[in-house]
């Protein structure tokens, strides 16, 4: 019987989380239909009393744990309890038709004697626990712009939205063009603009930053950027920048100095060099063979920064502080932060929040974000787990409704509410094929995906052109030019944003399959359920 319970709980995130308001969230997962009731017996470990025999016993409080979520295999019992002191001990009592069981650090047993109990513990809760995302972030409708492909300033030639095969092609989009498009964005109901990198770089994507204190001349000047930020703020929109602090460019002053002077360079420790003497010949020789330094994704033109070096950290953070203050930047999205040392992320978060406590910081994390969220390194992350579930069900059709609902139920059960509020939802980005490409041109599928994504807590982002049914496969084709010739003639844009605004008012409470291709979504606050079919 014990084996059949398939009980899961760990005294660590995401199964045990103390939220910013000091609410303890405990999650217990058991096999469906095996348990009738669950109690959590808990108290401060120092809260004790003597019994009649003189034995020291804890003053345990029994709290019934509600069944909160269930999928096709498991039931999730979620307890929310205010932490009245700084520590807690607890164990679970599971009631079934077969008997009563105890879950503690020993596992599942039928031994409930206090002298044998090995309770779980909530470690000391410090007053500087991670804070929630800024309140404004959860209501945002972002619009992501790849600057070179969005819009050219007045006086420049037209372009088209043909498929792109040349990864290095420049089309001339700039900051003035983005500013000229603000009336278009405002009409759609966009409340924030997320810009891919804009600093001086050696490529069209600009993820190979040469100078973090300079705007790329292909996009404009610093004054152009200041005017863009001012115009966005004047129109009630926020601005989010892409912070590429994991790696830089081989053209940067610091890297070129290492290439020229090898071990004599003062910047030697700014990078992770395996053979400093070979750098110059490797770069000048056309990158033949194995790189003598660490890079991002085996790309020799993007050497990795040594973010454990205090001088490197200061160099990068000073630049972020400069732009945050200069242009009242509202948010930062950090590129590949899973490769950046946590000490850098921790200091970045602290310094940015010191500048502006309402600044929003997200990370590009493609997998389970528990490690970063539990440490308070980000306010949220790009919500790839939810994106992949939506893509697999509605677009690839690689899973049925049961599997889709199971994945999303696990997400809700194992993602604390304070984390959910800071998430960044999306259906397309510069890193993945566009949603219309996956949908094979089916606009209903595009609408379904954005509708589904809109129901999740956190902000939602529309990748430029999705609303105009712009297609595009894998990089670089997902970065086609914005089809301005369709604006005003394509009714889908208004329909898409109308649905996003409408569904942002709801929040998913539970999701269940109707049949292989259809789902029912129950919303919080007693709103009518939503049914969707792919």
Stretches found by the model and what they are:
Residues 140, 146-191, 198-321, 326, ...:
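Substrate-binding/active-site clefts of carbohydrate-active enzymes
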Residues 229-238, 247-262, 325, 335-418, ...:
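Active-site-proximal helices and loops of the catalytic beta/alpha 8
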Residues 245-247, 315-342, 425-430:
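Active-site groove signature of glycoside hydrolases
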Residues 137, 153-171, 181, 406-409, ...:
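Loop/helix patches that line or flank the sugar-binding groove of alpha-linked glycan CAZymes
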Residues 28, 145, 185, 195, ...:
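Conserved, mostly hydrophobic/aromatic
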Residues 1-138, 191, 355:
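Glycan-association/targeting regions that enable binding to alpha-glucans and other polysaccharides
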Residues 141-143, 193-195, 239-241, 332, ...:
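Hydrophobic faces of well-ordered beta-strands that scaffold small-molecule active sites
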């Amino acid at each position: 019987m014990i084996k059949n319970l398939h009980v899961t709980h760990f005294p660590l995130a995401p199964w045990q989380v103390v939220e910013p308001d000091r609410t303890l969230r405990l999650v217990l997962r058991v096999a469906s239909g095996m348990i009738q009731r669950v109690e959590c017996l808990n108290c401060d470990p120092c809260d004790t009393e003597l019994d009649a025999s003189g034995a020291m016993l804890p003053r345990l409080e029994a709290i019934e744990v509600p069944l909160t979520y269930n999928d096709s295999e498991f039931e999730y019992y979620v307890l929310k309890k205010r932490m009245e002191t700084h520590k807690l001990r607890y164990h679970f009592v599971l009631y079934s038709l077969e008997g009563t069981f105890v879950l503690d650090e020993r596992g599942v047993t039928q031994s409930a004697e206090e002298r044998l109990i090995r309770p779980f513990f909530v470690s000391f809760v410090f007053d500087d626990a991670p804070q929630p995302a800024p309140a404004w972030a959860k209501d945002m409708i972002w619009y992501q712009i790849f600057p070179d492909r969005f819009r050219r300033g007045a006086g420049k030639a037209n372009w088209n939205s043909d498929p792109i095969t040349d990864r290095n092609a420049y089309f001339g989009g700039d900051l003035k063009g983005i500013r000229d498009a603000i009336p278009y964005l405002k009409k759609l109901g966009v409340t924030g603009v997320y810009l891919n990198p804009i600093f001086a770089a050696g490529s069209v994507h600009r993820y190979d930053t040469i100078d973090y204190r300079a705007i790329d001349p292909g996009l404009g000047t610093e004054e152009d950027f200041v005017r863009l930020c001012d115009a966005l703020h004047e129109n009630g929109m926020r601005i989010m920048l892409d912070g590429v602090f994991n790696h830089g460019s081989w053209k940067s002053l610091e890297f070129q100095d290492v290439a020229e002077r090898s071990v004599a360079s003062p910047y030697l420790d700014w990078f992770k060099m395996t053979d400093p003497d070979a750098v110059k010949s490797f770069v000048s020789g056309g990158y033949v063979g194995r790189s003598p330094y660490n890079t991002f994704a085996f790309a020799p033109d993007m050497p990795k920064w040594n973010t454990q070096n205090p001088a490197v950290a200061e160099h990068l953070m000073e630049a972020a502080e400069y732009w945050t203050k200069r242009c009242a930047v509202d948010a930062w999205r950090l590129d590949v932060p899973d490769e950046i040392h946590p000490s850098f992320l921790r200091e970045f978060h602290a310094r940015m929040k010191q500048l502006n406590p309402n600044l929003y910081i997200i990370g590009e994390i493609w997998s389970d974000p528990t490690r970063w969220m539990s440490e308070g390194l980000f306010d949220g992350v790009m919500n790839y787990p939810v994106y992949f579930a939506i893509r697999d069900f509605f677009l690839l059709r690689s899973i049925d409704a049961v599997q889709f609902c199971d994945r999303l139920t696990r997400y809700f059960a194992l993602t604390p509410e304070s984390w959910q509020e800071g998430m960044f939802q999306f259906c397309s980005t510069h890193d993945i094929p566009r949603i219309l490409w996956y949908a094979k041109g089916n606009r209903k599928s595009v609408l379904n995906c954005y509708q589904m994504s809109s129901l999740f807590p956190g902000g939602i982002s529309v990748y430029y052109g999705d609303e105009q049914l712009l297609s595009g496969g894998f990089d670089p084709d997902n970065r086609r030019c914005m089809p301005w010739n369709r604006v005003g003639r394509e009714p889908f844009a208004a329909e898409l944003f109308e649905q996003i605004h409408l569904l942002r008012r709801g929040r998913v409470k539970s999701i269940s399959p109707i049949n292989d291709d259809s789902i029912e979504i129950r919303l919080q606050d007693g709103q009518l359920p939503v049914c969707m079919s792919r």
